[in-house]
């Protein structure tokens, strides 16, 4: 199981009982890989906004009825104004990142040549009224929060028949952890400065009636590569407007960062403070405070709430830092500090008591291991799926054909929704969406045959020795019994993962005897290891 929470969103009184399994950003990534989004120069083009700056709308907005008719009249279903082609104003370049709901591209403003990031959400992924509300809410919230130094600025929102496009300032300074790792030296004072920027975002959101609900390191990017670059919060896809004291019930977020009251399905804005506290713990130690072999184990650890301050490097970390972490990670939300109180804590203040002595170098190496996802395992899973025999997958093949009602060679969300009950599979709407998002590896809104097989094959098939050996042979081109750096690069280039940094990450993660290559025993151990990752593995569908 992955360590990422569900990206399906509901308003609080619409929440239905779901399996408590946040699945995600992820990022990823990956999206939870997040798209870097650099800052425009002064005098940017006038933002393309709703005709008047909207106040926070009620979560239950009246539906535009009929939605389809609106689209046919040339009025966008999401933004509620005449459709406009973003490509008339911006030239799209390379892909910057990919998430469950959209792909982010480099976008150049034609009149000025200034560069932005454009998050493009395919209209086919907005099949239900809730989906439209979610994107509409994200646009409203980003406009509502505009102007804060540490929140990415939305420059314009465009909608045509094929997609909704959000043009934002481009952050080219990289992810939070990447900057720390690349710098190689790090202190409590540096951690305090970063935490101050993160909590400043939380304080601004809460004071303006917005709960973020998905705070994690991957959702913070540096604006540029300068040492004094501001840190920017970039993803408000799970955010909601709230009133003081209002409680929510839908399960959202990411497993490592999710608050205990979210798992209990009754929470308010204090859940953001918990998530920020988890980030601070990682900034100081390199690992999350709640850790287990799988997602359920992480949730159990979160609910138990035991925080380790005895292992390295905690004995050498200041009492002020530990005090702040403890007060942000109180089990009872009412006992947690507010964002304003955190910013006044003596350890975090700009002129505060956080020491400037370097933290142990192992903190950075542990952070790097925690951040790196096992890309080799993901490719190996696909290799196994492609090499299963016809006899082994005959049942899955028939299942695919029965779901693919239009014989297009792909399965859409609507086909899954209609077909699974006929196969005797009871599944909630939120689980259906989690399943679709997890299986749709290339993010195109549908599941192709190989994606379907990869997602549905049972783990006991995967663990068969001959399947693992076939996957190993795929990488071990010269049959030497080892996967070398060159062989990794050759195999992963096919999947656009063959860069030097990724190869080094994989070797560091899998090569347990440190000989610079991967032997068969190390490969088997990796394939059978279920330790959670930042971005989700594909969920088993049945």
UniProtKB/Swiss-Prot annotation:
Ca(2+) 4 binds at residues 511, 513, 515, 517, 522. There are 3 contiguous domains conserved in the CDPK subfamily: a kinase domain, an autoinhibitory (junction) domain and a calmodulin-like domain. The autoinhibitory domain (354-384) inactivates kinase activity under calcium-free conditions. Residues 90-348 form the Protein kinase domain. It is an enzyme of class 2 (transferase). It holds the Pfam family EF-hand_7. Residues 22-40 have a biased composition (Basic residues). Ca(2+) 2 binds at residues 440, 442, 444, 446, 451. Residues 41-60 have a biased composition (Pro residues). It comes from Oryza sativa subsp. japonica. This is Calcium-dependent protein kinase 15. Keywords: ATP-binding, Calcium, Kinase, Lipoprotein, Membrane, Metal-binding, Myristate, Nucleotide-binding, Repeat, Serine/threonine-protein kinase, Transferase. Activated by calcium. Autophosphorylation may play an important role in the regulation of the kinase activity. ATP binds at residues 96-104, 119. Induction: By N-acetylchitooligosaccharide elicitor. It is found in: Membrane. The gene is CPK15. It catalyses: L-seryl-[protein] + ATP = O-phospho-L-seryl-[protein] + ADP + H(+); L-threonyl-[protein] + ATP = O-phospho-L-threonyl-[protein] + ADP + H(+). Residues 391-426, 427-462, 463-497, 498-533 form the EF-hand domain. May play a role in signal transduction pathways that involve calcium as a second messenger. The active site is at residue 214. Ca(2+) 1 binds at residues 404, 406, 408, 410, 415. Belongs to the protein kinase superfamily. Ser/Thr protein kinase family. CDPK subfamily. One of its GO terms (biological process) is intracellular signal transduction. Its EC number is 2.7.11.1. It is a lipid-anchor. Residues 1-73 are annotated as: Disordered. GO terms for cellular component: cytoplasm; membrane; nucleus.
